[in-house]
Amino acid sequence: MCIRDRFFIAPDDSGYYYNFECTCIGRLLVGFRREREHATHATPRVMESILRNPSLGPRPFPEHEGDNRWSVVLAIPPQALFMHSLTDWSGLKAKVNLYKCGDKLSQPHFLSWKPIAAPKPDFHLPEFFEQIKFSEI
């Protein structure tokens, strides 16, 4: 079974972005990249700084039918954007998109917060990220 939530963020206009991919049981991958194929992955120290709370618990399980509601709460510190020197999120302007990917399920599905105008599902397209501003603290 493979269900992933993804958070993509470009904190500046360099063309690079971070992608945070988290499974429904809290397994996490963090990469910094300009394109899908070439990424610099976060160190174990960065990975440990990201708190995860999966509603389904941390153990793998087979796909099942019925009530499939779940959530994963991530607490991502600004330092997790490890190629930047952020110390807080306050007032940061960035471009982001959020996704849900169930590509290896018996009924594959893909969702995004903002639409992606591509012929097939592809989340690694920063041109479809949306500008946001984090609240001032």
At which residue positions do the language-model features occur?
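Phosphate/diphosphate ligand-binding glycine-rich loop within oxidoreductases
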Residues: M1
